[in-house]
Amino acid sequence: DFVIFTGDLTHTTDDPKERRKRMTEFRDIAAQLKVKTVRFIPGEHDASLDNGKAFKEFFGAPNYTFDHKGVHFIVLDNVSDPGAQLGEVQLAWLADDLKKQAQDARIVVFAHRPLFDLYPQWDWATRDGAKAIELLMPHTNVTVFYGHIHQEHHQMTGHIAHHSAKSLIFPLPVAGSQPKRSPLPWDPA
């Protein structure tokens, strides 16, 4: 029905012209997918250097909601702010949206960084993510998907399930398994 990319659509560059070139290339590649709808979330490589300006030009609002087949989807932007946070404005927006949802509504949240403190030393957290989780807690059927860590991970915060999947490229080590976060060597197997 749809595909959603959970961020890091491009690799970081300080050159605004190069950033736009890379986003154009990614948008053109994604447009070739044989699916009706493609949705995007910014990753820090797409948004942190210009507070999400180029991302918005190419892909639209970095946070939004949509409903599909009885599920309410919420897309959060926890990368455009260089402080790795959602911010008070977005948290108020989330609170307003959640007020419209029944307590037992099926809710799926997408974000780039994990909303909980997975490993803050490697920037694997959202500084005010606990506030978002607190807003989600009254709802009994919530699942969160995130990118950023480039590996499969599953975590529960109360009754809220959080999941990430492996990246197709740029594999990262398990949190804390080495002193510095750096890509793992390529394994041709």
Which residues does each PLM region occupy?
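A contiguous binding-surface segment within folded domains or other stable secondary-structure elements
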Residues: 119-131
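Extended active-site neighborhood of metal-dependent phosphoesterases/phosphodiesterases
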Residues: 15-106, 128-143, 155-188
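N-terminal active-site segment of His-dependent metallophosphoesterases
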Residues: 1-20, 118
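Short, catalytically relevant binding-site loops at active-site mouths
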Residues: 80-81, 113-117, 149-152
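Residue-level marker for buried hydrophobic side chains located in beta-strands
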Residues: 3-5, 40, 109, 145
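Short active-site segment of divalent metal-dependent hydrolases/proteases
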Residues: 10-11, 46, 115, 151
